[in-house]
Amino acid sequence: RDESNGEVKLTIYPGGVAGDESAVIRKMRIGQLNAASLSTSGLSYIVPEFAAITHIPLLYNSDKEKDYVREQLSPELIQKLEAKGYIFIHWGEVGWVRYFAQSPVKVPDDLKQHKLFIWADEGTDIQMYKTLGMNPVPLAATDLTVALQTSMVTAFSTPPLIALGNQWFAGAKHMTDVKWAPLMGATIMQKKVWDQIPPKIQELILTASKKAEIELTEEIRELDDKAVEVMSEHGLVAHKVTDEEYAEWEAIVNTVYPYIRGKLVPEEAFDKVVQLRDDFRANHLSK
């Protein structure tokens, strides 16, 4: 709004006011909403390949690996998004997903003893976790606090910032210090609405959005670790794992990769991100 001197008006519906991501997408399709910030899970309802960036556990060891894969995949994702009638505005991220539980979780067998919260609208994950021998409990995120208090749920996974912001860690004070996967998303807009905005203002919006993306990404990455420090001051115990324990997580993930490849992530996209990750590691290690 500021960049356009009021020519573009923006009304924001924060914190799930407009419904969950599937509801937001439905509202965009019928024109009730013009734009949205969605996680890669939400974006994958529109372009399934978005899931490849974040839905493969233990794919990345660092932000650099993740950034490389995302940068290489972005042009294709943006093109597919536009073909579906949406314009890509900017990326966003919330940090690295970790497991939080009411007792220490150092290896997968520890997690199998817990009742694990999963998002109610991600039905495909239920079968995946059951295949791994876990006990998934699908719920709305708004029910998680009470579920933890009553032990209906005893473990969940989320980035530290969200665990802190929602105070969920108060009900599960043991964090497994393994970066399971990044939580990321993007802001998109209906193309037919975007096309109504004058080109000069489109350019201003994209420039401002890119600047915000860079600044917020840097800030979020600092706050990801800071959130763990703050929670630790209020009773959280962060459990580091040994190389042997980490190998157990890798082993269980490898058993579920065939399920993820094809069911959660399109096969071609799955293979592509793994290859991109491997290429980055080979080039990085060779220098």
For each feature predicted by the language model, list its residue ranges.
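N-terminal secretory/targeting leader peptides
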Residues: 1-65, 73-74, 79-287
